Amino acid sequence: MKRPSGRAPHQLRPIRITRNYTRHAEGSVLVEFGDTRVICTVSAEAGVPRFLKGQGKGWLTAEYGMLPRATGERMAREASRGRQGGRTLEIQRLIGRSLRAALDMSKLGENTLYVDCDVIQADGGTRTASITGAMVALVDALAVLKKRGALKGDPLKQMVAAVSVGIYQGEPILDLDYPEDSDAETDLNVVMTDAGGFIEVQGTAEGEPFQPEELNAMLALATQGIRELFELQRAVLAD
């Protein structure tokens, strides 16, 4: 089996995370997984949703979108259609769930963090790139809030990262780009903590059902890839 990109089955795409990419947000990055590029910002506002008022806890929510020409053909903006699509809603909920798992909300105070992930170029794996990049922006945003004296303690419990895996031409592969994702027999999105726990495993068989041994092989491959992503996050944050 030869991957269209020429990568080995266990090989990630070239990945880069550029911090402080925009001027105004408390945390911001440009994350690049090969030709997939996403701007992730984290903005902090005082106050929480009504269901949390008076509890002394914070909240984090996420939004996700794609530029009209992030893909091969121009897409109409969802705002011009008057509603968000099901895929968009699913992805932004996934991003929010994943990043909330990184935090102790009781130490965030009554603050809300808004995570915005905007895909400027898509070549597969936009949701996993968004989670991995937004995690770095989140750490930077928390540092800003700490300097402002807005936190009750350190809300960061653990780091979070995500990657895609799949079965392509009968073999498990890591970090699918668009051509691979389009032709994969199975694709899986995996979100993990740096303690080794799973936050989310989303899997779909496009043709034949995948077998337990294939699932285990994909999870092992994802775990290895996410370990590499944690190393990259730590290196970027240490810079």
From Swiss-Prot:
- Record EC number: 2.7.7.56
Report the top EC class in one word.
transferase
Q: Answer whether the UniProt record assigns the keyword Cell membrane to this protein.
A: no
Q: Which family does it belong to?
A: Belongs to the RNase PH family.
On whether Transmembrane is a keyword of this UniProt record, the answer is no
Gene that this sequence comes from: rph
Q: Reaction catalysed by this chain?
A: tRNA(n+1) + phosphate = tRNA(n) + a ribonucleoside 5'-diphosphate
Which UniProt keywords are present, listed alphabetically?
Nucleotidyltransferase, RNA-binding, rRNA processing, Transferase, tRNA processing, tRNA-binding
**Subunit structure, interactors included:** Homohexameric ring arranged as a trimer of dimers.
Which Gene Ontology BP terms does the record give?
A: rRNA catabolic process; rRNA processing; tRNA processing
Function of the molecule = Phosphorolytic 3'-5' exoribonuclease that plays an important role in tRNA 3'-end maturation. Removes nucleotide residues following the 3'-CCA terminus of tRNAs; can also add nucleotides to the ends of RNA molecules by using nucleoside diphosphates as substrates, but this may not be physiologically important. Probably plays a role in initiation of 16S rRNA degradation (leading to ribosome degradation) during starvation.
The name of this protein is Ribonuclease PH
Q: Which PANTHER family does the UniProt record give?
A: EXOSOME COMPLEX COMPONENT (PTHR11953), EXOSOME COMPLEX COMPONENT RRP41 (PTHR11953:SF0)
Source species? Azotobacter vinelandii (strain DJ / ATCC BAA-1303)
Q: Which InterPro entries match?
A: ExoRNase_PH_dom1, ExoRNase_PH_dom2, ExoRNase_PH_dom2_sf, PNPase/RNase_PH_dom_sf, Ribosomal_Su5_D2-typ_SF, RNase_PH, RNase_PH_bac-type, RNase_PH_CS
Q: Where does phosphate bind?
A: 87, 125-127
Question: Where does the record place a coiled coil?
Answer: none
**Its Gene Ontology molecular function terms?**
3'-5'-RNA exonuclease activity; tRNA binding; tRNA nucleotidyltransferase activity
